[in-house]
Curated annotation (Swiss-Prot):
Main location: cytoplasm
Protein family according to the UniProt entry: Belongs to the elongation factor P family.
GO biological process terms, semicolon-separated: peptide biosynthetic process
PROSITE patterns xref list: EFP (PS01275)
Record keywords, A-Z: Cytoplasm, Elongation factor, Protein biosynthesis
Role summary: Involved in peptide bond synthesis. Stimulates efficient translation and peptide-bond synthesis on native or reconstituted 70S ribosomes in vitro. Probably functions indirectly by altering the affinity of the ribosome for aminoacyl-tRNA, thus increasing their reactivity as acceptors for peptidyl transferase.
Protein name per Swiss-Prot or TrEMBL: Elongation factor P
InterPro entries: Elong-fact-P_C (IPR015365), NA-bd_OB-fold (IPR012340), Rib_uL2_dom2 (IPR014722), Transl_elong_fac_P/YeiP (IPR020599), Transl_elong_KOW-like (IPR013185), Transl_elong_P/YeiP_cen (IPR001059), Transl_elong_P/YeiP_CS (IPR013852), Transl_elongation_fac_P (IPR011768)
GO cellular component: cytoplasm
Gene Ontology molecular function terms on file: translation elongation factor activity
Subcellular location as annotated: Cytoplasm
Alphabetized Pfam families for the sequence: EFP, EFP_N, Elong-fact-P_C
PANTHER family in UniProt: ELONGATION FACTOR P (PTHR30053), ELONGATION FACTOR P (EF-P) FAMILY PROTEIN (PTHR30053:SF12)
Length: 185
Protein backbone atom coordinates (compact mmCIF):
# COMPACT_ATOMS: atom_id res chain seq x y z
CA UNK A 1 0.00 0.00 0.00
CA UNK A 2 1.18 3.49 -0.83
CA UNK A 3 -0.13 6.80 0.47
CA UNK A 4 -1.79 8.92 -2.20
CA UNK A 5 0.60 11.77 -1.39
CA UNK A 6 3.44 9.56 -2.68
CA UNK A 7 1.80 8.81 -6.04
CA UNK A 8 4.03 9.76 -8.96
CA UNK A 9 3.60 9.85 -12.72
CA UNK A 10 4.26 6.44 -14.29
CA UNK A 11 3.35 4.38 -11.20
CA UNK A 12 1.05 1.36 -11.56
CA UNK A 13 -1.82 1.16 -9.07
CA UNK A 14 -4.58 -1.37 -8.45
CA UNK A 15 -8.01 0.22 -8.03
CA UNK A 16 -11.23 -1.86 -8.09
CA UNK A 17 -9.21 -4.92 -9.22
CA UNK A 18 -7.97 -3.10 -12.34
CA UNK A 19 -4.44 -1.89 -13.03
CA UNK A 20 -4.04 1.80 -13.77
CA UNK A 21 -0.96 3.71 -14.92
CA UNK A 22 -0.71 7.23 -13.47
CA UNK A 23 -0.54 9.81 -16.27
CA UNK A 24 -0.80 13.01 -14.23
CA UNK A 25 -0.91 14.05 -10.56
CA UNK A 26 -2.15 17.37 -9.15
CA UNK A 27 -1.94 18.10 -5.44
CA UNK A 28 -4.10 20.83 -3.90
CA UNK A 29 -3.64 21.81 -0.28
CA UNK A 30 -5.90 24.18 1.63
CA UNK A 31 -4.90 26.42 4.51
CA UNK A 32 -6.88 24.24 6.89
CA UNK A 33 -7.68 20.60 6.63
CA UNK A 34 -6.34 17.91 4.41
CA UNK A 35 -5.25 18.20 0.82
CA UNK A 36 -6.86 16.74 -2.25
CA UNK A 37 -4.88 14.71 -4.77
CA UNK A 38 -6.36 14.53 -8.27
CA UNK A 39 -4.94 11.97 -10.63
CA UNK A 40 -5.46 11.07 -14.25
CA UNK A 41 -4.93 7.35 -14.85
CA UNK A 42 -5.16 4.96 -17.77
CA UNK A 43 -6.83 1.59 -17.31
CA UNK A 44 -4.48 -1.02 -18.76
CA UNK A 45 -7.23 -3.49 -19.64
CA UNK A 46 -9.67 -1.10 -21.36
CA UNK A 47 -7.36 1.75 -22.37
CA UNK A 48 -9.75 4.36 -20.96
CA UNK A 49 -8.34 7.40 -19.18
CA UNK A 50 -10.15 8.27 -15.96
CA UNK A 51 -9.75 10.87 -13.22
CA UNK A 52 -9.59 9.91 -9.56
CA UNK A 53 -9.81 12.21 -6.54
CA UNK A 54 -8.25 11.18 -3.21
CA UNK A 55 -8.02 12.83 0.20
CA UNK A 56 -4.53 13.00 1.66
CA UNK A 57 -3.87 10.14 4.04
CA UNK A 58 -5.73 7.57 1.93
CA UNK A 59 -3.84 4.51 0.73
CA UNK A 60 -3.98 2.61 -2.54
CA UNK A 61 -2.41 -0.66 -3.62
CA UNK A 62 0.65 -0.46 -5.85
CA UNK A 63 0.91 -3.06 -8.61
CA UNK A 64 4.14 -5.01 -8.76
CA UNK A 65 5.65 -4.67 -12.20
CA UNK A 66 8.66 -6.33 -13.75
CA UNK A 67 10.74 -5.25 -16.73
CA UNK A 68 12.03 -7.41 -19.57
CA UNK A 69 14.58 -6.28 -22.13
CA UNK A 70 13.08 -6.74 -25.60
CA UNK A 71 13.66 -5.87 -29.24
CA UNK A 72 10.95 -4.22 -31.34
CA UNK A 73 10.44 -6.38 -34.42
CA UNK A 74 7.65 -5.02 -36.61
CA UNK A 75 4.15 -3.59 -36.87
CA UNK A 76 1.17 -5.41 -38.37
CA UNK A 77 -1.87 -3.11 -38.47
CA UNK A 78 -2.58 -2.05 -34.89
CA UNK A 79 -0.35 -4.75 -33.37
CA UNK A 80 3.30 -4.20 -32.48
CA UNK A 81 5.56 -7.24 -32.07
CA UNK A 82 8.43 -7.49 -29.60
CA UNK A 83 10.89 -10.31 -28.82
CA UNK A 84 12.38 -11.06 -25.41
CA UNK A 85 16.17 -11.03 -25.85
CA UNK A 86 16.72 -13.81 -23.29
CA UNK A 87 13.94 -16.31 -24.06
CA UNK A 88 13.20 -15.27 -27.68
CA UNK A 89 9.50 -15.29 -26.79
CA UNK A 90 7.40 -12.87 -28.85
CA UNK A 91 4.75 -10.49 -27.52
CA UNK A 92 2.11 -8.58 -29.47
CA UNK A 93 0.89 -5.30 -27.99
CA UNK A 94 -2.04 -3.29 -29.27
CA UNK A 95 -1.56 0.32 -30.37
CA UNK A 96 -3.84 1.47 -27.51
CA UNK A 97 -1.54 -0.08 -24.90
CA UNK A 98 1.58 1.46 -26.42
CA UNK A 99 0.03 4.93 -26.76
CA UNK A 100 2.30 7.80 -27.83
CA UNK A 101 5.35 5.51 -27.80
CA UNK A 102 4.43 4.38 -31.35
CA UNK A 103 6.08 7.55 -32.66
CA UNK A 104 9.46 6.53 -31.23
CA UNK A 105 9.58 2.84 -32.21
CA UNK A 106 12.02 1.80 -34.94
CA UNK A 107 12.54 -1.77 -36.13
CA UNK A 108 15.29 -3.68 -34.25
CA UNK A 109 15.30 -1.07 -31.46
CA UNK A 110 16.02 -2.40 -27.95
CA UNK A 111 13.82 -1.26 -25.07
CA UNK A 112 11.99 -2.57 -22.00
CA UNK A 113 8.45 -3.91 -21.62
CA UNK A 114 6.53 -3.64 -18.35
CA UNK A 115 4.83 -6.81 -17.16
CA UNK A 116 2.22 -7.45 -14.48
CA UNK A 117 2.38 -11.17 -13.70
CA UNK A 118 3.05 -12.51 -17.21
CA UNK A 119 1.01 -9.92 -19.13
CA UNK A 120 2.79 -7.10 -20.99
CA UNK A 121 1.14 -3.80 -20.03
CA UNK A 122 3.42 -1.08 -21.35
CA UNK A 123 6.56 0.12 -23.06
CA UNK A 124 9.53 1.81 -21.37
CA UNK A 125 11.40 3.84 -23.97
CA UNK A 126 14.99 5.02 -23.74
CA UNK A 127 15.24 8.73 -22.86
CA UNK A 128 16.32 9.63 -26.39
CA UNK A 129 15.96 8.14 -29.87
CA UNK A 130 17.56 8.98 -33.20
CA UNK A 131 15.07 9.53 -36.02
CA UNK A 132 15.43 10.56 -39.65
CA UNK A 133 13.64 13.69 -40.88
CA UNK A 134 11.53 12.74 -43.92
CA UNK A 135 9.76 16.05 -44.47
CA UNK A 136 10.50 19.66 -43.55
CA UNK A 137 10.33 23.06 -45.21
CA UNK A 138 13.48 24.37 -46.89
CA UNK A 139 15.55 26.97 -45.07
CA UNK A 140 15.93 30.48 -46.41
CA UNK A 141 18.52 33.12 -45.66
CA UNK A 142 17.29 35.31 -42.82
CA UNK A 143 15.06 32.65 -41.20
CA UNK A 144 17.03 32.77 -37.98
CA UNK A 145 16.21 36.44 -37.39
CA UNK A 146 12.78 35.56 -36.03
CA UNK A 147 14.11 32.68 -33.90
CA UNK A 148 12.09 29.56 -33.21
CA UNK A 149 12.07 26.71 -35.64
CA UNK A 150 10.12 24.91 -38.32
CA UNK A 151 7.93 21.79 -38.25
CA UNK A 152 9.40 18.48 -39.37
CA UNK A 153 7.99 14.98 -39.81
CA UNK A 154 10.19 12.04 -38.80
CA UNK A 155 10.30 8.52 -40.25
CA UNK A 156 7.90 7.22 -37.58
CA UNK A 157 5.31 9.95 -38.17
CA UNK A 158 6.41 12.05 -35.19
CA UNK A 159 5.98 15.79 -35.73
CA UNK A 160 8.62 17.92 -34.02
CA UNK A 161 9.82 21.53 -34.18
CA UNK A 162 13.44 21.65 -35.38
CA UNK A 163 15.92 24.50 -35.92
CA UNK A 164 16.02 26.07 -39.38
CA UNK A 165 19.33 24.40 -40.30
CA UNK A 166 17.87 20.86 -40.13
CA UNK A 167 17.06 19.47 -43.58
CA UNK A 168 15.20 16.48 -45.01
CA UNK A 169 17.26 13.28 -44.77
CA UNK A 170 19.21 14.30 -41.66
CA UNK A 171 19.04 12.34 -38.43
CA UNK A 172 18.04 14.08 -35.21
CA UNK A 173 18.02 13.11 -31.54
CA UNK A 174 14.59 13.46 -29.90
CA UNK A 175 13.69 13.34 -26.18
CA UNK A 176 11.01 10.63 -25.77
CA UNK A 177 9.71 12.17 -22.53
CA UNK A 178 8.88 15.57 -24.04
CA UNK A 179 8.88 14.90 -27.78
CA UNK A 180 11.30 17.77 -28.35
CA UNK A 181 14.33 18.08 -30.62
CA UNK A 182 17.66 17.83 -28.76
CA UNK A 183 20.38 17.91 -31.43
CA UNK A 184 21.49 16.59 -34.79
CA UNK A 185 22.74 13.03 -34.61
Amino acid sequence: MVEVGDIRKGMALIIDNDIYIVLDVNKHFTARGSGIIRTKMKNIRTGYVREFKFNSGEKVEEASLSLRHVQYLYRDGDLFYFMDLETYEQYALDKDIIGEAVYYLKENMELDLQFHDSTPIGVVLPNTVILEVVETAPSYKGDTVSGGGKPAVCETGLKVIVPFFVETGQKIKVDTRTGEYIERA
